[in-house]
Structures are given as structure tokens and as C-alpha cells.
Amino acid sequence: MQQRRPVRRALLSVSDKAGIIEFAQALSARGVELLSTGGTARLLAEKGLPVTEVSDYTGFPEMMDGRVKTLHPKVHGGILGRRGQDDAIMEQHHIAPIDMVVVNLYPFAETVAREGCSLEDAVENIDIGGPTMVRSAAKNHKDVAIVVKSSDYDAIIKEMDANEGSLTLDTRFDLAIKAFEHTAAYDSMIANYFGSMVPAYHGESKEAAGRFPRTLNLNFIKKQDMRYGENSHQQAAFYIEENVKEASVATAQQVQGKALSYNNIADTDAALECVKAFNEPACVIVKHANPCGVAVSTSILDAYDRAYKTDPTSAFGGIIAFNRELDAETAQAIISRQFVEVIIAPSATEEALKITAAKQNVRVLTCGQWAQRVPGLDFKRVNGGLLVQDRDLGMVSEAELRVVSKRQPTEQELRDALFCWKVAKFVKSNAIVYAKENMTIGIGAGQMSRVYSAKIAGIKAADEGLEVKGSAMASDAFFPFRDGIDAAAAVGVSCVIQPGGSIRDEEVIAAADEHGIAMIFTDMRHFRH
């Protein structure tokens, strides 16, 4: 469908001024008459562009501190008027057709994100005229182009040049979709904000406000269609949040390899989020969303070597994440040793990419460096509903630990305990992690009873010939019985770190004392389902 409409008159009114001067100059150079409002009009005039203020065009001034600017029949009639059908009535009322509307909206999200933002501040940043023009233009996309993203400016000028100043219906329809997505996201933000403010509005505590709105509106953008979902009979796609501020699998750039699968993305997310927990050079190997090997060291090469030794069998076909740049030596070690689905790191050297390119099926992602973790929400779909909670960003410091056993942990035991506690947070419950000298030596994941996770971790260590004696054990939740401690003692664990909080804590602590095990309570649980 290539029905073209020439662009002879455009209305520009933007809060985000990025690229607007160059775009307006390009339109004007192509003979497009410019209408504009407020700050946008002043900016264009300062740059010497011929621009007509909307208030001059309508004969009606802006009023109420700018609350009323474009809500006028000469504006909306010019946008909504159907060419060839409403021409006579437009002429009768001196309404000129407006062929393009360039609008982005008041920065509501940025306003409410500011510390100390009041309800009054938020209200004044709710755009009224902008969304109205956007929706009007999108509704009449058969005749009008609506532009809400500055990233479209260049493509629009190129198409106008290729079509003698016109845009095709296909383009106008695509722009209309973006416009409706834009206003839907905008209204969702406002609804979420107001919904979360209900307790505070009614005089309840500030802590009750700002948490979970009574209606949750979510907006995600499709990044890619998948060949299939978790299983081949399921269809799937990958959607991402807009303006993600933290390095993530959603923002990562794939620099090599074939398209990511549904399971690749899920596992890569698990690996990356785990490796972010460490400051030292670290490697995390994940299989089926569970870490199967984790280590920190003085280099990522040594960290990889030690993580791999935890469970070479499970590492086959796994996902590998690093918190440092992927170098050639480490890339060569991986490619020479194992089959890997995905490697993700903040960056990769050219030499490393040349090495991984030798294996066409290896996907390499770079995600950039990360700093502080960004609070957000986690979701779990249930039939007919959605469970929503804060991201689990909790982590205890050494100063917050409580030693509850008779024996104090040694410095090395304490380091190992904190290390495997970080890992346990990312293992499916019931989770047990054995670690020694900053590497995992056995991981028991996803068992229905905690004691069996402990037994499996010991079996895995024995299968790989790893020395458990003198190791630390982490449990993501409390031990309901002493049997888990007895199982750990049987294979030589000398230090246990766990949340505590069981009604049988005394019994569990007594078991640790019987075996000469140092026991540390974190008072923080990390269930992961």
C-alpha cells in the first residue's frame, strides 16, 4: 500500500528537543510550513527558521500557564480533517490541513523519579494537548504523519526526498502504531503513579505509598521473535523494557553467533545476574538456569578454569558469564575445552572474537560495565494472575553475620562462606552450595527436601574428585532439621552459613557443635523458585 501524501504543513511541539532543530531545518528547506508552540517555537525562531506560533495561527492565546495551547478546532480540525471528504467544511471555517505532527510528551517519568517529587509536581507534568494531538494524528494516519520519536527524523527526510516531499501510507501507518504505543505507555505511567499514591493521598504512611498500584500497567517492546519457546511446540518472543539503566541480557549486544533461543536468553540472564554479585574477576557457568560452577580469582582465565572443574559434565552446552573483558587466552581455553552455547561479558577483545568465530554456533554477547544494581520488580505468571515483588537485591555484609556455634569460623572459612552464600542466592530452591578457596565444589539445586540437596552437592564434589574437607556450605533457607548438618559433616564441611529462623534452630546449632562445625546466621533468606 503506497498511497502517498505530500507534507506541506507540520506542527512541532516537543519536550525533548534532541534533533528537532535539524529536523525542522530539513522540513523548512523542503518547503514545509512550520507551526509550533511555546519553547519549541522560540527555539526554532532563535535559529532563524520561519515559524508561526500556534496562538497566532488560531487567534487564541496560550493560557493558564500553558495548560491550554493546542486544544482548538483550527488545530484538531487541521489534523483530523479527512482529505477529499471534509475539505468544504475546513475551508468554510478557515482550517488549514496539517500534514505532519511532531510531538513528544511532558517528561512525567523523569519528574516522578526525582527525589522529593510532590503530587503537584507530577500533576503539572501530565501532558494534555500533546497526547490529544498524537491520537488525532494517529487516528487520521491515512492523511497525516505523526512523529513521536526523534530516531525517526532522518528516515522521514530520506523518504520525503525519495518521494517528492511525500510519505507513503505504509510509513504513516507504522508511525501511527508508534504513536499509540507512546500514548499507551504514557498513560500507563500516570495510572501506575496515581494508583501507588492512593495510601498517601488518604493520609496513610509514606511507606505505604509508592509500592504497588491497584492496577498494574506494563509496557514492553518486542526485541525479537523466537523460533519457538521453552519447548518446540510453544511460540515465543522476547520483549524488553524501554530505557533500561542496568547492564542486562535485554540491553546486551550480540556480536557473534546465530540467533538466541528462548532458553539461551533465560539462562544467560541467570548467569549474568549471578556474576554481577562479585567484585573480583569471576566466572559463572549456568545450565538450565542454575549455576553449575562459579569461581573468583586473580584473572578470568583462572576463574573459568576453576568454575569448569566444579562440574565439567553439566558445563557442556552451558552459558558462561564473566565480569571482566573476554580476552583471547580465556576464549581459547573455552573453545578448546567444551561446547558452549553463549558467552557474555562486559566486552571482548578483537583477538577473543576471532577465536570464538571459529565456532559458528557460539553466541557472544557484550553487555557493558555495570555499577550499582537498579531496584525493580520481578514477575511470576500464575494461571489467571501475576505475582509481583521487588527484585531480590538483598545481600548481607560481614558485619551483619551472626556466629551462633561454639566454634568461630577461621578467616578462610568466613571468606568461603560469604562466597558460597552469594552463589546460593542464584540456585533454585532448595539450594545447597559447597565452596572452598573461592570456587564451588558441589551444588545441589531444586530438590524438594534440603537434605537431598546437601547430599547431591556432596556427590557432585566426590564425582569430580574435589576435596570437601574444610569447605563451607551455604543454604538459601533455614535447615528444618539437623539431618542437613549431619550430611554436610559426613563429607567434611567445616563451616555452614544459613539464614536461621527455624523452630528447631537450637537442634541444628547443637548438631553443628557436635561436629565441630562453625555456623553463621545471615537472618536473610533467598528462596528462588
Curated annotation (Swiss-Prot):
It comes from the Bacteria. InterPro entries: AICAR_Tfase_dup_dom_sf (IPR024051), Cytidine_deaminase-like (IPR016193), MGS-like_dom (IPR011607), MGS-like_dom_sf (IPR036914), PurH-like (IPR002695). SMART domains: AICARFT_IMPCHas, MGS. Its EC number is 2.1.2.3, 3.5.4.10. Residues 1-148 form the MGS-like domain. It catalyses: (6R)-10-formyltetrahydrofolate + 5-amino-1-(5-phospho-beta-D-ribosyl)imidazole-4-carboxamide = 5-formamido-1-(5-phospho-D-ribosyl)imidazole-4-carboxamide + (6S)-5,6,7,8-tetrahydrofolate; IMP + H2O = 5-formamido-1-(5-phospho-D-ribosyl)imidazole-4-carboxamide. PROSITE patterns: MGS. One of its GO terms (biological process) is 'de novo' IMP biosynthetic process. Belongs to the PurH family. NCBIfam families: PRK00881.1, purH. The IMP cyclohydrolase activity resides in the N-terminal region. This is Bifunctional purine biosynthesis protein PurH. The gene is purH.
